[in-house]
Design a protein with these regions (language model features):
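Positions in alpha-helical segments
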Residues: 6, 60-61, 126
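Short loop-to-helix capping motifs
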Residues: 14-15, 70-71, 133-135
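Aromatic- and glycine-rich beta-strand/loop motifs that create alpha-glucan
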Residues: 1-20
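Terminal transmembrane helical anchor/hairpin motif
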Residues: 28-35, 104-109, 136-208
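Short, membrane-interfacial amphipathic segments enriched in basic
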Residues: 1-4, 117, 121, 160
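Secretory targeting signals
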Residues: 20-53, 78-135, 168-185
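Transmembrane alpha-helix boundary/anchor motif
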Residues: 45, 49, 53, 58, ...
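Helix-loop-helix units of permease transmembrane domains in multi-pass membrane transporters
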Residues: 51-85
Length: 208
């Protein structure tokens, strides 16, 4: 089993991933995907599955064992890719379950968009974890950034809707290429954040 497969297995079978799926499914079922509670919980729940994985490896000392068995690049990419996938699924999977099995009428939601939004916030949380060496900042930092972006876009930067978190999931503006335009933007953000994560972890390993 390579580094990525091991990380993905740890992420998807972690208690925090299961907890996140249950929480989001409850919110979607009792309220709706469009509810304010769902919107607020997205960056928080997305941070749960695997954003602090590198911190745990560092504090336990396992990182040295991992780096003996795998290349540095494979180790770092395995961490961030597993984080992105698990964070995306913890948001999109509950919506899919609700649409398929719990909704009064079967419906289709923008699952790819919700997956990408979750992946983005999970990667942001992972960057914060490495940058601050603090799990609490990782779990709460994405929410703070999301909230600041909401305030900025609603009060001061109304025309800059491409950085408005709610607009990614529930568009009110006319997007170039419509949903595909939002997908491209989110993928671009994710790639940038992943690159930042890679460089931060690489430097941390080098300095250790």
């Amino acid at each position: 089993m390579n580094s990525f497969e091991a990380d993905l297995k740890r992420a998807l079978f972690s208690p925090l991933f299961v907890f996140g799926v249950i929480v989001m499914l409850y919110i979607v079922n009792k309220m709706s995907v469009n509810s304010d509670l769902f919107k607020i919980c997205v960056p928080v729940v997305a941070s749960l599955p695997y954003s602090t994985a590198w911190l745990k490896d560092k504090r336990s000392g396992f990182i040295r064992l991992y780096l003996i068995r795998t290349k540095e690049m494979e180790y770092i990419l395995g961490k961030i890719l597993a984080c992105a996938i698990s964070s995306g699924l913890v948001i999109s999977l509950p919506i899919w379950i609700y649409d398929k099995y719990l909704a009064e009428m079967e419906q289709e939601s923008a699952y790819v968009i919700f997956f990408l939004v979750g992946a983005l916030w999970g990667c942001v949380s992972a960057v914060l974890a490495v940058w601050t060496n603090n799990s609490c900042v990782a779990y709460g930092g994405a929410f703070v950034i999301c909230y600041l972006l909401i305030i900025l876009c609603e009060r001061y930067l109304q025309n800059l809707y491409c950085i408005y978190p709610y607009e990614w999931m529930f568009p009110q503006k006319q997007w170039v290429f419509e949903e595909n335009g939002r997908r491209i933007l989110l993928v671009g953000f994710i790639v940038v954040v992943m690159c930042i994560y890679y460089e931060l972890v690489r430097r941390k390993i080098k300095d250790a």
